[in-house]
């Protein structure tokens, strides 16, 4: 089973992806990690990418997509779940073409729907436990709301990440994601159109629900 996921930062996309990965024993492949692995490993593609990154430039799709395909083939023997790519319409088209050329099927595309303001609130509401960063706390999500200013799990002190409080940075990321003309949602709709043609399956999930309710709905729609 091969899956592509879409959802704004704050939608719980990573959480649901991890749950699906565990249930179906998929390789959870995140685009940022691919860059780190290739650069850290000193691969030819990684060094080319590093040259652009060091100059503060975007890595061209002609480098990024081969890196992704190489990783999918190397780690996705039992299936894969790709997170964080494509981020725009052009990348969506190029990735689809590359998958077709390699004979790699795309079984499902998952989109988690979430209002932009709710997504922003969730990001800014994140709190990190000083004892264990894996203890989820968020002042805007009832199920994981902290106990006052203490961790809901262990009672430890809480802190915030500086980038979670940077409204300008959050808005810029969301400007790209919610752009239905050329941005990430345009990419998602490209695959939705393919699903309408029977070339893949498209699952839409309402992200405002609880983690468990979203999980149940998602798993019920996966074969």
From Swiss-Prot:
UniProt note: domains: Consists of three domains, a large central CORE domain and two small peripheral domains, NMPbind and LID, which undergo movements during catalysis. The LID domain closes over the site of phosphoryl transfer upon ATP binding. Assembling and dissambling the active center during each catalytic cycle provides an effective means to prevent ATP hydrolysis.
Entry's EC annotation: 2.7.4.3
Predominant subcellular localization, coarse grouping: cytoplasm
One GO cellular component term: cytoplasm
Protein's name according to its UniProt entry: Adenylate kinase
Chain residue ranges for the region called NMP: 30-59
Species the sequence originates in: Solidesulfovibrio magneticus (strain ATCC 700980 / DSM 13731 / RS-1)
Entry-linked Gene3D superfamilies: P-loop containing nucleotide triphosphate hydrolases (3.40.50.300)
HAMAP family per UniProt: Adenylate_kinase_Adk
Keyword ATP-binding set for record: yes
């Amino acid at each position: 089973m091969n899956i592509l996921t879409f959802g704004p930062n704050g939608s719980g996309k990573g959480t649901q992806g991890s749950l699906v990965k565990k249930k179906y024993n998929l390789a959870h492949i995140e685009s940022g990690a691919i860059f780190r692995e290739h650069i850290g490993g000193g691969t030819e593609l990684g060094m080319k990418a590093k040259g652009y990154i060091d100059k503060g430039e975007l890595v061209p799709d002609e480098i990024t997509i081969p890196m992704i395909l190489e990783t999918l083939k190397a780690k996705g023997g039992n299936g894969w779940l790709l997170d964080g790519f494509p981020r725009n319409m052009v990348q969506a088209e190029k990735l689809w073409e590359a998958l077709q050329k390699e004979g790699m099927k795309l079984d499902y595309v998952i989109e988690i729907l979430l209002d932009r303001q709710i997504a922003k609130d969730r990001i800014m509401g994140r709190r990190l436990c000083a004892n264990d960063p894996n203890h989820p706390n968020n002042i805007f999500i009832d199920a994981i709301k902290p106990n006052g200013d203490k961790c809901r799990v262990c009672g430890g002190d809480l802190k915030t990440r500086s980038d979670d409080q940077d409204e300008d940075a959050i808005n810029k990321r969301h400007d790209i994601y919610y752009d239905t003309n050329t941005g990430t949602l345009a990419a998602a709709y490209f695959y939705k159109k393919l699903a309408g043609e029977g070339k893949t399956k498209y699952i839409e999930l309402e992200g405002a629900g609880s983690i468990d309710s979203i999980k149940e709905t998602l798993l019920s729609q996966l074969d």
